[in-house]
């Protein structure tokens, strides 16, 4: 989401700034997301549910290739969200930085459900001079992120699989995830039918879509530096 800092004369922009840090953080976040997808890919396709064969990508290049679309999906959603804020700032003549992506260490080093990133932020340097501009800038990010997330979620659900509840419970590790807004209709339309005593095992891309819907909804809360705040 956007981070407001500083002030300037409306209609003027800061001089061009170096984007080296933006590029470095982008590469690190893309890499960490691919690695997270590499782990997810192994868990989804393993014969023993949720089993990770190796944490070394060189030992499982096919799984690393499976992690690539995961990383692309994560970056696409984050980029859509932040560019929604950025382009709306430019529309109103307000100076803003390019997105700063926030990478996370590999999941085997820092156990987490986050898909290789803590998100991204832009820095708004200009003064927001009207409530209309403030509202439009705030809402543009979540809308753009949602638009990017829905096709990814739909495809991921179409590739998800159904297993027995017993298989899930005996796998040694499982999480029952909640259903953010739009998950229900998307799951019914794109996902496989889940019968009694069965559960849905999400494809890695379905998890990306699920996570995007959850974070977008949380971002709209009227709290602090969140988009709704």
Regions found by a protein language model. Give the residues of each.
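Hydrophobic transmembrane alpha-helices and their immediate loop junctions
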Residues: 1-229
């Amino acid at each position: 989401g956007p981070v407001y800092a500083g002030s300037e004369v409306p209609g003027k922009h800061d001089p061009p700034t170096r984007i080296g840090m933006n590029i470095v953080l982008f590469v690190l976040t893309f890499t960490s997301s691919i690695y997270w997808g590499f782990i997810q890919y192994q868990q989804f396709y393993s014969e023993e549910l949720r089993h990770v064969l190796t944490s070394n990508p060189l030992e499982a290049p096919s799984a690393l290739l499976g992690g690539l679309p995961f990383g692309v999906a994560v970056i696409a959603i984050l980029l859509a969200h932040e560019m929604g804020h950025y382009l709306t700032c430019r529309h109103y003549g307000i100076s803003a930085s390019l997105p700063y992506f926030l990478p996370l260490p590999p999941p085997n080093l820092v156990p987490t459900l986050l898909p290789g990133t803590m998100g991204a932020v832009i820095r708004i340097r200009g003064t927001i001079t009207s409530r209309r501009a403030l509202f439009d800038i705030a809402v543009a990010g979540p809308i753009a992120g949602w638009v990017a997330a829905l096709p990814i979620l739909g495809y991921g659900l179409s590739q998800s699989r159904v297993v027995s509840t017993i298989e899930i419970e005996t796998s040694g590790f499982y999480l029952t995830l909640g259903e953010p807004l739009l998950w229900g209709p998307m799951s019914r339309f794109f996902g496989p039918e889940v019968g009694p005593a069965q559960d849905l095992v999400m494809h890695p891309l379905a998890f990306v879509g699920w996570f995007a819907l959850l974070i977008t909804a949380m971002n709209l809360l009227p709290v602090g530096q969140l988009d709704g705040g």
